[in-house]
Amino acid sequence: MGRLFGTDGVRGVANADLTAELALGLSVAAAHVLAEAGTFEGHRPVAVVGRDPRASGEFLEAAVVAGLASAGVDVLLVGVLPTPAVAHLTGALGADLGVMLSASHNAMPDNGIKFFARGGHKLADDLEDRIEAVYEEHRTGAPWDRPTGAGVGRVTSYGEGADQYVAHLMSVLPNRLDGIKVVLDEAHGAAARVSPDAFTRAGAEIITIGAEPDGLNINDGCGSTHLAKLRAAVVEHGADLGIAHDGDADRCLAVDHTGAEVDGDQILAVLALAMRERSALRSDTVVATVMSNLGFKLAMEREGLSFVQTAVGDRYVLEEMKEHGYALGGEQSGHVIILDHATTGDGTLTGLLLAARVAQTGRTLQDLASVMERLPQVLVNVPDVDRARVKTSAELATAVAEAERELGATGRVLLRPSGTEPLVRVMVEAADIEQARSVAGRLADAVKSALG
């Protein structure tokens, strides 16, 4: 069996790859692994379970709850909430485990399972590996040790989670948003209720789009992966900025008053300067990934800030932040982690802080984001190739070396197998867009030739 866990939990097509049987089995295995690790010692274990609004979340939620309760874990069902809300509630309610059912920005047919440890942090890789091993052991015949009678878990609907999460967001906002007009695109996802509520409570005038989830329309032509509607709405309504979330609202992209995109790198740059001003940017350091634009690194250096780079995936950004005590990190895709206030990327918190900076300074988001100049960057996804051989193919290594010689010091190349999808990402930065496109196209062809 290949590794089930990717960089962001377990994902696949619901009811094909991610079945009710798999969801149930992994949940039972997670309960047993945490019990064996001593997490439940001395008390009756509790788990928080939430989901995004996609239709398959309903039967997968039932399977996860059945698995946990059958393993003796009491379950608090918080319903449809963003991933960062489930992580926050896992910590705030003192739960031993959190489970989020979502495939984030993926299309509606997909779904996923993400586990959070006590405190709301993602499970460590070694615990995920152990869950897989225990699941596989019992899938092939070993019986579970099952509690009976009063030992089985109880299931309770917990309806206060949304209000608790929004109250938390209000408590960490540095200033109000009075006088600011914001367009919110909620991707017909998990933040369709809480994000507009939070911005309204903070004093902003809001226009909301993509906030009518029906279980089928999540991420469909809207949200952080499809910004066209948000751009148009910002210009139409004369808004100060627009905020886009994905299906589970763990990421945030923005649009300035002209309709131009402000990506995760630019958001990090704006927040880094704001946090330094408040003496909240510990060690004057920002953590980002190898996918961050070279312009971000140059901007941070110019502003006298340090820049630490990690592998792609917000879990690796978070690990670096936790290990060294850094306060701010994130990804170009819009995952932004403010570790003093969240244990994972939080799109609503990020959007609130970005709007707060606009309100506090009186400057436009366009002006604030100009602190960094994005170098032309081209990203090409190459599907249906053997992504496991990216680092071992001699043919591909030769093609990369030739590209790097052509780009010189004014560009860079990155080939990366996706952690959540069956494809290889080719990223090229160059001094001009035509060169970046040309090199990226040749490298994409080389990937197909070498790994197809």
UniProtKB/Swiss-Prot annotation:
Activated by phosphorylation. Catalyzes the conversion of glucosamine-6-phosphate to glucosamine-1-phosphate. It catalyses: alpha-D-glucosamine 1-phosphate = D-glucosamine 6-phosphate. GO terms for molecular function: magnesium ion binding; phosphoglucosamine mutase activity; phosphomannomutase activity. It comes from Streptomyces avermitilis (strain ATCC 31267 / DSM 46492 / JCM 5070 / NBRC 14893 / NCIMB 12804 / NRRL 8165 / MA-4680). Binds 1 Mg(2+) ion per subunit. The active site is at S104. Belongs to the phosphohexose mutase family. The modification Phosphoserine is found at S104. Mg(2+) binds at S104, D246, D248, D250. Coiled coil: none annotated. This is Phosphoglucosamine mutase. GO terms for cellular component: cytosol. GO terms for biological process: carbohydrate metabolic process; peptidoglycan biosynthetic process; UDP-N-acetylglucosamine biosynthetic process. Keywords: Isomerase, Magnesium, Metal-binding, Phosphoprotein. Its cofactor is Mg(2+). Its EC number is 5.4.2.10.
